[in-house]
Amino acid sequence: NQELQAFDETLREFLTEPDHFLTSLALVNHLQRTPVLAAQDLYAVEVEGKKVVPVFTSEQDLQSFKATQESAREQTWVERSSLDVLTQLVQAELFGLAFNLKEDGDVSNTTLFASSELIQFINYFTQTLNNLLGEENQKADSKDKIYLVPAFVHKREEDGQDDRLFATMSNAEGQSYVPVFTNLTSFAKWYGNETFGLPFRKAKGTILQWPLSEIYQPSTGENELDKVQG
């Protein structure tokens, strides 16, 4: 199953670099679209004192799990939507989803997601996609569009307001500009670039979702725009 394999690879990438913006988007896309291997009926096991529902992005990991868990062998394992399983476990007041549970071996795709945190994560990145790629934003004037804006955000101790510095780029004349993006393709090129995106990611930069007016006149906090041309 190529889709499940792609889901597995994305999960591994996310667990290696959980702050990676594009990997997070890809993971949410898989959670919404790619079925996982899960028990047909609600089935939970205890891990670290918490009741979790095991799901798998690897057939091999499922077989290994069944080999070590007698109760798992009694279940009928099928392809199911992660979101359906998540809804079910929330209703049953269980802790969360456990991906690719195993006792030893390659654990680079093994993790527990608390349901509350996972729902928040899915909602945030779904909203990001809707803000950026929704029909309303596509049709909006450039001054009204929502852009992806790379920035460094520091909270001031005295009043809790945000100070924001932007990941500026310079032209041959030495003039600085704030990079903003309306589509994921151009953003991905910048984000993956060794000169721009890599240092930004290492410095734990934040991706804001803003119209241009927020850059020049923010509704909260302060933006550092000295010597920036545009």
Positions of predicted regions on the chain:
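An interfacial alpha-helical scaffold signature
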Residues: 1-230
